[in-house]
Amino acid sequence: MQRSFEKEIYPGKWEIGAGGSALKGEDKIQAVKREIREETGIDTGELKEIYSLVHEPHRALYAGFLLTTSFDKKGIRLQEGETIDYKWISKGELIEHYESEACLPSTRERLCEFINSIR
């Protein structure tokens, strides 16, 4: 997903997937499904947690999920003000992005173990 140029942090940068915060009363699965639906229109698929960590000093829980879906690519809807473009990438392209300067440092930290597991 390419971040909107209106975003305060990392405007226009490419991220690996959708993201956001849980709303009061949501568990992490509900939050992930809502964020994916809001940012992409994808409302179906199988989620597999690939990382979970607590980020200090914010005491925030970060969790990452891999979504497997047969959702029709023609149905992708980008969330206005959040994202401006998307692309599907292969495992090789994911690893290549992870190793490039374009990968956000926070993404690299969070995905390290997962990337090493799929090499």
Task: List PLM regions with ranges.
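Conserved Nudix-box catalytic region and its N-terminal flanking loop in Nudix hydrolases
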Residues: 1-34, 38
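Secondary-structure boundary elements
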Residues: 41-43, 72
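A short coil-to-beta-strand element that immediately follows conserved catalytic motifs
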Residues: 43-51
